[in-house]
Amino acid sequence: MAVKIRLKRLGKIRAPYYRIVVADSRTKRDGRVIEEIGKYHPTEEPSFIEVQSERAQYWLSVGAQPTEQVEALLKLTGDWGRFKGDKDAVSTVRVREAKPAYVADEKKKPVLKPKTEKAAPAPEAAAPEAESTEEQA
């Protein structure tokens, strides 16, 4: 059985994101997979790349062939270099900077008004109406 490591496309039109999967080479692009080993979001800035290194190394060691795109991603994460024997392979994936935490200004503290309970309709007002209808009948 020929096994490939390739990209499975998800997302909307013009907004793709991919899963890095291990699948039989004869299956459809988005068909049945053996295992999902990572994610790739090319539309984010910088691109989001996440690969489970242990699983990628395992599948490469048992003969799975990566496609050109996946091979490029594995080179970025350093997994391809480790597979080829380079013990010092390092990930060159850029990571998004964390957003600073939002701190609310104490002077502009929002004012919360307590909710007022709606008064129940007075039973006295409803009772005379009921009596008047009985008198008319």
Curated annotation (Swiss-Prot):
Region Disordered, residue ranges: 104-137
Any one GO cellular component localisation term in the record: cytoplasm
Entry keyword Ribonucleoprotein: yes
Keywords attached to this entry: Ribonucleoprotein, Ribosomal protein
Biased amino acid composition, Basic and acidic residues: 104-118
Keyword Ribosomal protein: yes
GO molecular function: structural constituent of ribosome
Annotated GO biological process: translation
PANTHER family assigned: 30S RIBOSOMAL PROTEIN S16, SMALL RIBOSOMAL SUBUNIT PROTEIN BS16M
Family: Belongs to the bacterial ribosomal protein bS16 family.
Name by which UniProt lists this protein: Small ribosomal subunit protein bS16
